[in-house]
Amino acid sequence: MPTVRKLLNEQDFQEALERQLRIRVFEGQHLVDNGTVIIRLDGDTVITQKSVSDITYHSRRDCQFFEVRK
């Protein structure tokens, strides 16, 4: 069963970016992205990529981010 850890601070996000960790993204109560990696981030936005043509922009304020480890 996978282990899930919430990304809470800048250090968590930087680790996920540098180590290319797979994450899940929730907006409200809805899962909007799963199995994606962070390719860029700033204070307001997290940009994720699942495949070559699947790039998504997520608001840090409106979304919750979770690292998924198997």
Each language-model region and where it sits:
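Conserved RNA-binding domains used in RNP assembly and mRNA/RNA metabolism
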Residues: 2-70
